[in-house]
């Protein structure tokens, strides 16, 4: 199998990409590549605490490849830091990087351009999947997630902190992508078929910052809850 890093935002699309790739024999996920705002010690954009992402990595049984970004971070700084991380990956025998992008062609083209001549092949496991069908498949399979960030220009701020479930999908306005691919919202996954055990999290205060609304998630306590075997779970391979 090709040794592969998975771009891990802590959200549902990267988690579902992991689930799909584990059912194939072509790619072996050996690391979760996550960028952190160094000043805040949180995932960029999702604003999820580093400790929660570390807990996710333990729950899926894959090492975390963390990348600390300065704040503010220019595009030039970002690209330079990621270029060095890619060099490290190649030297470690990594062959591919997987991304959870769904349909934004400009984002895909940017990733492909940045990886040209890097020695790393970009792959897109969930690319082109109909997003309503995809969202329902995630929920049916047992994926559990909270909305951690909402763009109030696109979606009412009252949705932040909500559970990503069928009820939520039914309440979305018709112009909202069910997976939030246009930047309407971002999520944090705390349970699912890709996890060895569920994470216990609680939703704290809501904060408005930099034009976005965030729900501050924190660990509820240290005890872990074993995942219940779900009828829709694919067998481990």
Predicted regions and their residues:
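Nucleotide-activated chemistry modules centered on ATP-dependent adenylation/adenylyltransferase
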Residues: 1-237
């Amino acid at each position: 199998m090709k040794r592969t890093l998975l771009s891990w935002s802590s959200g549902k699309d990267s988690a579902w990409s992991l689930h799909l790739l584990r059912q194939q024999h072509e790619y072996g996920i050996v690391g979760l590549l996550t960028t952190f705002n160094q000043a805040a010690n949180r995932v960029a954009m999702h604003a999820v605490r580093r400790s929660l992402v570390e807990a996710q990595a333990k729950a899926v049984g894959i090492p975390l490849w963390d990348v600390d970004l300065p704040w503010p971070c220019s595009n030039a700084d970002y690209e330079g830091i990621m270029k060095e991380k890619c060099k490290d990956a190649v030297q470690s025998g990594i062959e591919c990087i997987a991304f959870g992008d769904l349909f934004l062609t400009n984002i895909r083209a940017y990733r492909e351009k940045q990886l040209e001549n890097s020695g790393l092949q970009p792959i897109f496991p969930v690319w082109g999947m109909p997003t309503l069908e995809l969202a329902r498949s995630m929920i049916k399979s047992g994926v559990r997630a909270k909305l951690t960030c909402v763009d109030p220009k696109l979606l009412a701020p009252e949705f932040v902190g909500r559970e990503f479930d069928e009820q939520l999908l039914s309440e979305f306005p018709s112009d909202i992508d069910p997976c939030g691919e246009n930047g309407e919202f971002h999520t944090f996954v705390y349970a699912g078929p890709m996890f060895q055990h569920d994470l216990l999290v609680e939703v704290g205060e809501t904060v408005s910052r930099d034009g976005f609304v965030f729900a501050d998630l924190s660990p509820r306590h240290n005890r872990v809850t074993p995942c219940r075997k779900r009828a829709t779970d694919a067998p481990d391979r």
